[in-house]
């Protein structure tokens, strides 16, 4: 009985073992015919060649793209410095000029005061809840509490006490104010 061998092997009944087909391609057994057929071998080799070429080109193109982007960033660092610092600001140089002007004006007085244009700015809220509610106190901006945010839920709990031996009133009776006093004097 012949043993099951791999696709590229045949069973040698003299040795009772599987042997590679490439050893018998000059006179192949029936199981090695597809492996040793030159037309099948060349088509498989052609497929592997196409795959290796595709993989090589992909690797070369990705390395070239990375190198070009790296070189462009190194050659043009001024473009990154000119970008606006805050999302609402369109011209970053105008903000720096304003800061320099305020800084020179402040240096005549107290050195510990920093210009307001260098402070961190927060954009105004544009949602309906923020527009309807007015900020309180000295704050320029309104930050809603977590329970007021969209999708938040509020947990409401009630306290119950031991009313002695009488039964505890139901929640509906407590809410409606219909509970009867348990202790009478």
Swiss-Prot record:
Superkingdom of the source species: Eukaryota
Record keywords: Adaptive immunity, Disulfide bond, Immunity, Membrane, Receptor, Signal-anchor, Transmembrane, Transmembrane helix
GO cellular component: membrane
TNFR-Cys repeats: 4-36
Oligomer status and interactors: Associates with TRAF1, TRAF2, TRAF3, TRAF5 and TRAF6.
Record's keyword annotation contains GTP-binding: no
CDD domains: TNFRSF17
Organism of this sequence: Mus musculus
Location of this chain's protein in the cell: Membrane
UniProt tissue specificity: Detected in spleen, thymus, bone marrow and heart, and at lower levels in kidney and lung.
Disulfide bonds: 5-18, 21-32, 25-36
Extracellular side: 1-49
GO molecular function: signaling receptor activity
Parts of the chain that traverse the membrane: 50-70
InterPro entries the record matches: BCMA_Tall-1-bd, TNFR_13C/17, TNFR_17
Lineage of the species this protein comes from: Eukaryota, Metazoa, Chordata, Craniata, Vertebrata
General function of this protein: Receptor for TNFSF13B/BLyS/BAFF and TNFSF13/APRIL. Promotes B-cell survival and plays a role in the regulation of humoral immunity. Activates NF-kappa-B and JNK.
The keyword Transmembrane appears for this protein: yes
Membrane topology: Single-pass type III membrane protein
Name of the protein in question: Tumor necrosis factor receptor superfamily member 17
Pfam families, sorted: BCMA-Tall_bind
GO terms classed as biological process: adaptive immune response; lymphocyte homeostasis; tumor necrosis factor-mediated signaling pathway
Residue numbers on the Cytoplasmic membrane side: 71-185
């Amino acid at each position: 009985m012949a043993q099951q061998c791999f696709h590229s092997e045949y069973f040698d009944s003299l040795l009772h073992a599987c042997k590679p087909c490439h050893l018998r391609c000059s006179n192949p057994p029936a199981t090695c015919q597809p492996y040793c057929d030159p037309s099948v071998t060349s088509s498989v080799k052609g497929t592997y060649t196409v795959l290796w070429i595709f993989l090589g080109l992909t690797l070369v193109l990705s390395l070239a793209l990375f190198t070009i982007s790296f070189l462009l960033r190194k050659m043009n660092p001024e473009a990154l410095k000119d970008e606006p610092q805050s999302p609402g600001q369109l011209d970053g140089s105008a903000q720096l000029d304003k800061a320099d002007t305020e800084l020179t004006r402040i240096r005549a007085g107290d050195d510990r005061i920093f210009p307001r244009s260098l402070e961190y700015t927060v954009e105004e809220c544009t949602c309906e809840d923020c527009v309807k509610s007015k900020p309180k106190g000295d704050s320029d901006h309104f930050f809603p509490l977590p329970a007021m945010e969209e999708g938040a839920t509020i947990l409401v709990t009630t306290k119950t006490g031991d009313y002695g031996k009488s039964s505890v009133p139901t929640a509906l009776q407590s809410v409606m104010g219909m509970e009867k006093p348990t202790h009478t004097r």
